[in-house]
Structures are given as structure tokens and as C-alpha cells.
From Swiss-Prot:
Keywords, in A-Z order: Hydrolase
Quaternary assembly: Homooctamer.
Keyword Hydrolase part of the UniProt annotation: yes
UniProt cross-references to NCBIfam families, sorted A to Z: PRK07235.1
Homology family: Belongs to the amidase family.
Highest classification ranks of the organism: Bacteria, Bacillati, Actinomycetota, Actinomycetes, Mycobacteriales
Catalytic activity: a monocarboxylic acid amide + H2O = a monocarboxylate + NH4(+)
Class of the enzyme per the UniProt entry, highest EC level: hydrolase
Protein name per UniProt: Enantioselective amidase
Length: 517
């Protein structure tokens, strides 16, 4: 147990200067006894926590060899199960390594988190195990989950199973989760999405899954609470619906769920309902400045499949979609700098679960290993801190106000149609850089693909992504966006598309494995 030493005179002076209190030295000295008494309460709280914190379970885990981990997608492997029965009985699941598993080390793709072993299981893990799933391991993710590419994870990139030379990116930040499902190493996985981190690798690796409505599922290990989402990654819409059924619902620990009344829904049963007929193609989701025209063509061809299935398909313009990324960018940058970096992951001023040991571990390791953070995280830290200091919070406040306008524009279209449709990404998976590249190119490869995905993190709409086709021998994703808290209906529309196209293609090296499942 640590002790909290009262500040000395130099530290008192620094605190005074930080807040511009203008206290003279004699006045500062008057505050010293009162401050010491205040600090005593913090020490008392620490003693109580240490007395009540549970001991982590004794769970075995293994660091796989290179031969066992050809895609560099596993952080550690395990075999944890609770029951032989349940809707996920017999299914193996990979957990993104930003989700806590008691007694199993986690890294979150970063040297700053490396060495931490949590005492607690995340709610989503407990629900999966209670449903009969077997946890097969922790999947590698990007450094603090802040990259849409798969090149920032420590110690090496996650590789795309569609390329037999393993020279292409898997997408991020849930890079390992997607690669493991696509390659047949596991049946399903859990990922996180704050700017597209589930949907980007879905499109790159050619599987299906979703970012549900914000707050539908309890989150863990936050970046910025208002954009954090967890979601399922699977090979079929049916499996995604089954996972969503298991994982959805409040747990009393996640403040993201405080404003939502979440009733239990059987998303798998919803697939038996008649599909809606109104689909709208969002013009601004196509022909972006970085768009590959062949990707647009593949998505348009997939939309024709929807039309041939007797669905009404129309085209609409939502101009504010072009500005929505900028709104997300301010919130994600300032919010992550405040909560994830300065706030040592959790920040303050909200209810819910906190892990004091993780906070102090992150705080100490950030000071020791901050130089090893990815360039994307460094950009977020510097940019977010600068705009917050120079603007006094006005930029984040303005972005928060604009969220309402962006959400209202999507809701207006969704009031007349069942779902919105656009490409998930502007291009297919790209090659992993083989040498150090200029900063501008590095940031472009890590973040340029999220122009369509990020807006729906900030508005909270559910977004599901089936495979639309292939370009250059690599998968293309199509994003189908539904009404908030109407995830079951959105899943249904994606299932209608999946039924029309049949089975999705699989990576060459996974074909034999998946054929036996």
C-alpha cells in the first residue's frame, strides 16, 4: 500500500501557478494543514479498496510461437470455459486485447499497458462464457486502439489472411480479432469501435459484424466514452445476431448505458421476420477524395443485388455527412487526450466501474514509455491538448452541439427509409510498409480510411458490414446503417442481403479449415 505525502512548498507553488490562484506564500502556507487533512481521505479510500479487491483467478495462458501465430494476430492464447450448454456452446471466441480477462495479461497493443494483469473479468467476457463459448485467447489490437490500420501494434503488424505472402494490412484497430475469424482460427470475436475499428478490418478481411447502437453493450478500457462501442465479428449474420443477443444489455457498471433503457431482444429470432423494403444510397458516401472507383462499383453492384431481391432502393443526398468526420475528429482528439492520456484511461466525473490498479499502471508506464507510443497516439495527445488549452474547451463544445445536427440529418433520412447504405471504406486493404515512412504517409495509412465509418461512432447509429464483393483479389465492405436502438431491424436487412448473395468468399489459406467446420 502506498502513502500519499503532502506537497512540499515547491509543489504547493506549482499547484497555485497551475490554477492561477494568485496566492501569496503566506496564504499558501495557511492551506497546508487543510490540504494534508483532505489527502488523508484519499489514503483511507485506498486502504478500503485494497481490502476488498478480489484476487484474480489462476488461469493458464501461452504466448504462441511464430509458427502458431502466422498472422501475428494472437497476443496470448488460453482455454477458458464455464459451461457446455448455451447458445454459444462449442464456439471459440477471441477477445480484443482491450477487454479485461482476470488473471490473463493484457497489452492493448502498447508498451504503455504491457505488464498489466487485471483482477476483473469484463462483463462481455462473463456473458460469453455463461452462454457456453470457449475463450481461445486475446487478440492483438493497435496501440491504444487508435489506428484504422494494422501497423501500430506492438511488437509487429497484424497481417491480412487474404494475401498468402502476408504482406497486406488487416485493418484496425480490432486487427487481430478480424484476422483470426477470417482465417478460421476462431468462430467469432469481440472488437471495439471508436472510429471504425470493427468495421475497417471487417472490410479488409472479408467477414461480417457490427458496431451496435451506442450503449447497447457494456464497454471496457475506454478511449472516449461517447464514441466507444463493442461489437461482434463473425462469418455470418446469424452468428453476429446470436452474439449480439448474448452481449446486449445493461450491467450497471458502464456509464455509457445510463441514458438507455435496454430491453432484452432475441436478434437471431428477428431474422425470421419479413425484411423491410426501403434502402437509401447516400451520395456523399461515394466518390470521396481518396476513393478507389472500383470499390464504389463493387458496392453499387451489391446494391443491385438488394434491388433484385425486391427491395426498394433510392438515392439521397445528406450533405452534412461530408462534415461529420470533422465533428468526430475534434471529439475523438480532445476527448482521448483528456480521458485516455491525461486521465490515464478512465478520466473522472462519471459513474461506473474504475480500476485503480490499471490507472496507476498506465500512469507510471506512460511516463516511462511514452516515447514508444505510436505516432497516431502522439498526434492525438499533442493536438487534443493544444486545442483544449488554446480554446478553453470551445472546440469540443462546438463539436458536441454539431453532433445533434449530424444525427438529425441521418435520422431524417431514416424516418423515410429503413437503412442507409454506402461503402465501408474508400479502398481495399493496402500493403504493410516495409521500411520507416514519412510521418504524413504514416498518418495517412493509419487514419485516411475512416471518413465513412467515424460519423456513426459520434451519432451512435448501428452500422453492420457485410461483404459486398472483391477488388484486386481483396474484399470490399458495404456499410448498412439503421435507426438508433433498432439493431434487430438493421441485422434483418443485412441478413436479406446475405441470403441473396449466398456464402461469403473466404481467404485461400482458410478454405480447407472452414470447410471442415
Amino acid at each position: 500500500m502506498s502513502s500519499l505525502t503532502p506537497p512540499n512548498s515547491n509543489q504547493m507553488s506549482a499547484l497555485n501557478n497551475h490554477f492561477f490562484f494568485g496566492l501569496t506564500t503566506p496564504k499558501l502556507e495557511e492551506f497546508a494543514p487543510a490540504l494534508e487533512a483532505t489527502l488523508a481521505y484519499a489514503v483511507t479510500d485506498e486502504r478500503v479498496y485494497e481490502r476488498t479487491a478480489p484476487e484474480p483467478p489462476d488461469r493458464s495462458w501461452t504466448t504462441p510461437t511464430a509458427a502458431e501465430n502466422p498472422l501475428s494476430a494472437w497476443y496470448v492464447t488460453t482455454s477458458i470455459s464455464y459451461t457446455d450448454g448455451g447458445p454459444l456452446a462449442g464456439r471459440t471466441v477471441a477477445i480484443k486485447d482491450n477487454v479485461t480477462v482476470a488473471g490473463v495479461p493484457m497489452m492493448n497493443g502498447s508498451r504503455v499497458v504491457e505488464g498489466f494483469t487485471p483482477r476483473y473479468d469484463a462483463t462481455v467476457l462473463r456473458r460469453l462464457l455463461d452462454a457456453g463459448a470457449t475463450k481461445a485467447g486475446k487478440a492483438v489490437c493497435e496501440d491504444l486502439c487508435f489506428s484504422g490500420s494494422s501497423v501500430t501494434s506492438h511488437p509487429q503488424p497484424v497481417r491480412n489472411p487474404w494475401d498468402e505472402s502476408h504482406g497486406y494490412k488487416a485493418g484496425g484497430s480490432s486487427s487481430g480479432s478480424e484476422a483470426l475469424v477470417a482465417s478460421g482460427h476462431v468462430d467469432c470475436a469481440v472488437g471495439g469501435d471508436g472510429g471504425g475499428s470493427i468495421r475497417i478490418p471487417l472490410a479488409c478481411c472479408g467477414i461480417v459484424g457490427c458496431k451496435p447502437t451506442h450503449g447497447l453493450k457494456p464497454y471496457t478500457f475506454p478511449i472516449e466514452r461517447t464514441i466507444d462501442h463493442l461489437g461482434p465479428m463473425t462469418r455470418t449474420v446469424g452468428d453476429a445476431a446470436m452474439m449480439l443477443t448474448v452481449l446486449a444489455g445493461t450491467d450497471g457498471l458502464d456509464p455509457r448505458q445510463a441514458d438507455h433503457r435496454i430491453e432484452p431482444v432475441d436478434y437471431l429470432a428477428a431474422l425470421a421476420e419479413p425484411a423491410g423494403l426501403r434502402v437509401v444510397v447516400v451520395t456523399e458516401g461515394f466518390d470521396t477524395p481518396v476513393q478507389d472507383a472500383a470499390v464504389d462499383d463493387a458496392v453499387r453492384a451489391a446494391i443491385l443485388v438488394l434491388r433484385s431481391g425486391c427491395l426498394t432502393v433510392e438515392i439521397v443526398s445528406i450533405p452534412i455527412h461530408l462534415d461529420a468526420f470533422a465533428v468526430w475528429n475534434v471529439i475523438a482528439t480532445e476527448g482521448a487526450a483528456y480521458q485516455m492520456l491525461d486521465g490515464n484511461y478512465y478520466g473522472m466525473n462519471t459513474g461506473g466501474f474504475y480500476d485503480p490498479e490499471l490507472i496507476i499502471h498506465f500512469s507510471r508506464r506512460r511516463l516511462e514509455h511514452g516515447h514508444q507510443l505510436s505516432k497516431t497516439v502522439k498526434l492525438v495527445g499533442m493536438g487534443g491538448r493544444y486545442t483544449s488549452e488554446t480554446g478553453g474547451g470551445k472546440y469540443a463544445a462546438a463539436a458536441r452541439q454539431l453532433v445533434r445536427e449530424v444525427r438529425a440529418a441521418y435520422d431524417l433520412a431514416l424516418a423515410r427509409y429503413d437503412v442507409l447504405v454506402m461503402p465501408t471504406l474508400p479502398y481495399t486493404a493496402t500493403k504493410i510498409p516495409i521500411t520507416d515512412i514519412p510521418l504524413a504517409d504514416y498518418l495517412d495509412t493509419a487514419l485516411s480510411m475512416i471518413i465513412n465509418t467515424a460519423p456513426f461512432d459520434v451519432t451512435g447509429h448501428p452500422a453492420l458490414c457485410p461483404v459486398a464483393g472483391a477488388v484486386h483479389g481483396l474484399p470490399v465492405g458495404m456499410m448498412i446503417i439503421g435507426k438508433a436502438h433498432d439493431d434487430d431491424a438493421t441485422v434483418l436487412r443485412v441478413a436479406a442481403f446475405e441470403h441473396a448473395v449466398g456464402n461469403y468468399p473466404v481467404p485461400p489459406e482458410a478454405a480447407s479449415t472452414l470447410a471442415t467446420l
